[in-house]
Regions:
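Exposed, low-structure sequence patches enriched in small/polar residues
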Residues: 9, 254-256, 388-837
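Short, ordered, surface-exposed loop/turn motifs in non-cytosolic proteins
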Residues: 23-25, 32-47
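A short, amphipathic beta-strand motif
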Residues: 25-31, 58, 93
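Short Pro-Gly-centered beta-turn/loop motif in secreted/extracellular proteins
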Residues: 35-39, 61-68
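A short, solvent-exposed loop/turn motif at the edges and junctions
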Residues: 45, 69-82
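Short, acidic Ser/Thr/Gly-rich low-complexity loop/linker segments typical of extracellular
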Residues: 49-59
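Structured extracytoplasmic
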Residues: 111-283, 289-297, 359-460, 464-467, ...
């Protein structure tokens, strides 16, 4: 949901601009002599960065730009230029073979297939790959450099006719913000600009490297949102820095194979185009493209020095139009390498432009990232710069640098619109009705209602104000939380709720003291929090597995009747600490009274427990919303271990018990075959306890998908005191659908999944055994609860489609066994919202 809310930031200005549908050219490129379709031909508007590649049958689609000229070219054919007018929606282009280009090859009836054998382009690329180590700065004992980066987000391809609309004559601040992009020659309207100056330091032995942020500042529409850093953080993770000398290039939250990776020769096709000068260096120009245009790979050009070093001087990477990447209309990356006076070749220019479109009838967006690397040095670096295990650090004065600092370090000047961003924001605020639009979008993006310009108390979550359950019927809830505008260290959040059927009143209050200063919420990374909680409420036993609020209105729609519930009174003291390098520790003390409710029967009991948890997730990156924290970089593994000790007699605790749990999450990428997410969880209850303290399956009773939960296991259907669960999900990124002609146009993504639960109940926790008939601890299991066969794990499988209308997902789930006397359905459907590239 966090990604979906980010789109809301762009929608804010889109709502103010007239929407216009795009016209599309659907064309076919054929051989003039044979009439056969010509695959992998380049179709490009002259002078514009708008490119399409024909599919193997010669078909292509590209936006219709009236009055422009379309250039069609492919190796072995003469280039042809076509004028585009209003009648060009269906375009037929025939190309004539270039006799000069074919003079040195034998012409057969069928065109010659691409061959890697005896191919001079392939032989050159083998030398480029073999010489990669020469550019690897990590072989040096030390190195450091300064990186200046500017990231601009803007509305793209603004219609000039739209700006002539009389309604805009009253908005001079809007017209003045529109400018021509030097990269695409299109009209753009910058919405935000983010600048960062970073010092990168590296030491070979003992190995360490750090990024130290020396200066950072941001201005734009994200300033209107208290959690506006989500936009910048997510954008930087999506459009991350790359190095083509790495085998895998991660961008758009996907790994792409670099054109000079060790395995690139089998994935890409290479063609030598020409020999030319790049600046003053003689270079061989190579063109490359993926074997299959639908796979996640680049198309582009390499300029390799014409000497024994085979050093890449310049590279241009373009995402083929046929690549099944959502929301991206065009993407181009440019990297340039410079030779230092000492002889080393280093990256000096790293630019990226990504043109995006949410839907064809929405205004387009563009992200422009400009990066300059300079001040390379290889001298010994002081040890104090490597203190601590964190890979990144921010200087205390980074956000307070003056204009002198930026004039010194800004390697690329701001455009006129970027410099006047403050005037643009002031103009927006002065516009009639803007306050109401902003309030609505804040509600969509943040799920809380602010009580002032610098809100000290936020009201919400809004989606939890109305819900229903078996005990309460209609349930209303009013809650809120304080912000750092009231105190940088002390925070409170809570709610009061009313069940209109039960006539019960519920409450929750939590006070948090943060040992480090916060910008807005206490959950900001890294946590150094001490919290005390007091709650009285009603819940289903399966609610404890939900990652969202149990009162969320969307979670109230369930496929099973949840009539077995419990009242609980909970007091809890928690200390949580996070380290910048990925370690999280948590210690808590809790006392809780439980009483059965609805159709679940057991006597009231109390537990008192101490709990310790440790989690390690190296490289994890987080963003904060007002509700919770979201992990951005899902490539980071997560390893968690916890132990709970129940103490009889302490604060009225009725039982002594030990419960241990461990879990591991890891994502694996398989190139064009997509990714596999694997989550494994295991737990053991070591002592004899009543069934509410046993291991229950993580049951998802909602029609909406929830990660790492079983879709077709009912509430408390199985009882175990030891278990292992596995959640396997393979997202194939359209690998199959992209090869089905009609479905390919829908840009759907297929995925398959399987969930397994192995469980066992030891004799000491089985209330139905004769040996336990006199036990004062065990309680009879609820009706319809049963035991698992330790030799037969439970299985359910799923087949799903994501990216339906780019947002929605539908998943078919099937229960494979334990179908005798089952309570729920054997087959069902789950819905979800997923925003992915």
């Amino acid at each position: 949901m966090s990604k979906i809310r980010i789109i809301g930031l762009f929608l804010m200005l889109m709502l103010l601009l007239p929407l216009h549908a795009q016209e599309i050219i659907r064309g076919h490129v054929v051989d003039e002599a044979t009439g056969e379709g010509i695959g992998f031909a380049s179709v490009q508007y002259k002078g514009l960065n708008l490119v399409a590649i024909t599919d193997p049958q010669g078909y292509f689609t590209i936006r219709l730009l009236k009055g422009k000229r379309l250039t069609v070219s492919v190796l072995g054919y003469k280039t042809r230029t076509v004028d585009v007018d209003g009648d060009s929606e269906k375009l037929f282009v025939s190309l004539r073979q270039d006799a000069k280009a074919l003079k040195e090859v034998t012409v057969n009836k069928k065109r010659t297939r691409y061959s890697r054998k005896n191919n001079p382009a392939v032989e050159l690329m083998k030398r480029v790959v073999a010489n990669k180590k020469r550019t690897n700065l990590a072989l040096r004992d030390y190195y450091q450099y300064t990186k200046y980066q500017k990231l601009t987000l803007a509305l793209n391809d603004v219609d000039p006719e739209m700006l002539e609309n009389p309604r805009f004559s009253k908005m001079p601040w809007l017209l003045e913000q529109v400018e021509v992009s030097q990269l695409t020659n299109k009209l753009i309207l910058p919405l935000s600009v983010d600048e960062t100056v970073t010092q990168k330091v590296y030491r070979r032995s003992p190995h360490d490297e750090k990024s130290i942020v020396k200066g950072m500042r941001s201005s734009g529409i994200n300033d209107f949102f208290q959690t506006g850093e989500i936009l910048n953080t997510m954008t930087k993770d999506i459009f991350t820095d790359i190095n083509i000398y790495d085998d895998q290039v991660r961008i758009l939250q996907h790994p792409f194979l670099s054109p000079i990776a060790d395995g690139a020769i089998s994935f890409y096709r290479y063609y030598i185009e020409d020999t030319l000068l790049v600046e003053r260096d003689s270079c061989i120009h190579l063109h490359f493209l993926p074997n299959n245009q639908q796979d996640f790979g680049f198309r582009g050009d390499l300029y390799v020095l014409k000497d024994s070093s085979c050093q890449v001087k310049r590279c241009e990477l373009i995402l083929p139009n046929q690549t099944d990447v959502n929301f991206v209309e065009n993407m181009k990356l440019v990297q340039e390498f410079t030779q230092l006076p000492t002889g080393e070749w280093v990256l000096s220019v790293d630019d990226m432009i990504v043109e995006m479109v949410l839907f064809d009838f929405f205004q387009k967006g563009v992200a422009i990232k400009t990066t300059r690397l300079s001040d390379y040095a290889f001298d010994e670096i002081p040890k104090q710069l490597f203190r601590g295990k964190a890979k990144s650090a921010i200087d205390p004065d980074a956000e307070m640098q003056d204009d002198t600092f930026w004039q010194q370090h800004r390697k690329v000047q701001l455009t006129k619109s970027e410099e006047s961003m403050g005037d643009f924001l002031n103009g927006m605020q002065s516009m009639g009705g803007f306050k109401y639009v902003l309030t609505a979008l804040k509600l969509l993006a943040e799920n809380y209602i602010e009580t002032g310009q610098k809100s000290k108390v936020d009201i919400g979550p809004v989606t939890s104000m109305l819900s229903n359950n078996f005990i309460d019927g209609l349930r209303t809830r009013f809650g809120g939380q304080t912000t750092a505008n009231l105190s940088r260290h002390l925070f409170w959040k809570g709610y009061i709720a009313r069940g209109w059927k039960s006539k019960n009143t519920y409450y929750s209050g939590e006070m948090t003291w943060s040992l480090n200063r916060k910008k807005y919420t206490p959950d900001e990374f890294p946590k150094r929090n001490i919290s005390i909680l007091s709650t009285y409420d009603v819940m289903s036993p399966s609610d404890k597995f939900l990652s969202s609020d149990k009162d969320n209105v969307f979670s109230s729609w369930k496929w099973a009747k949840v009539d077995k519930m419990m009242f609980y009174k909970r007091q809890k003291l928690t200390f949580e600490r996070e380290e910048p390098w990925g370690l999280r520790t948590m210690f808590s003390a809790k006392t809780e009274e439980n009483e059965s409710a609805g159709n679940m029967q057991y006597f009231k009991f109390r537990t008192t427990e101490l709990r310790a948890e440790i989690e390690y997730s190296p490289g994890a990156l987080y963003v904060n919303s007002k509700m919770r924290r979201h992990k951005v970089n899902r490539e980071a593994p997560i390893i968690t271990l916890s132990h709970t000790y129940g103490i009889e007699g302490l604060l009225g605790g009725d039982y002594t018990y030990h419960y241990t749990e461990a879990s591991v999450f890891k994502r694996f990428w398989f190139g064009s075959w997509g990714r596999i997410d694997l989550y494994t969880r295991a737990g053991v209850q070591w002592n004899q306890v009543p069934f509410p303290l046993l291991c229950m399956p993580a049951s998802n009773l909602s029609y909406f998908s929830h990660k790492h939960m079983f879709n077709l296991i009912n509430n408390m259907e199985f009882m175990n005191d030891r278990f292992v669960s596995v959640d396997f999900n393979w997202d194939m990124q359209g690998k199959i659908f992209n090869r089905i002609p009609l479905i390919r146009r829908l840009h759907w993504r297929e995925y398959i999944g399987a969930k397994m639960l192995w469980g066992a109940l030891s004799d000491k926790n089985n209330p139905y055994l004769q040996q336990n008939s006199d036990s004062k601890v065990l309680i009879a299991f609820p009706e319809q609860t049963r035991l698992m066969n330790p030799d037969i794990p439970y299985w359910e499988i799923s087949l799903g489609i994501r990216s339906i209308f780019r947002f929605f997902q539908v998943e078919y789930v099937r229960r494979m066994n334990y179908n005798d006397n089952r309570i729920g359905p054997k087959n069902s459907v789950r819905l979800g919202f997923t925003l992915m590239f």
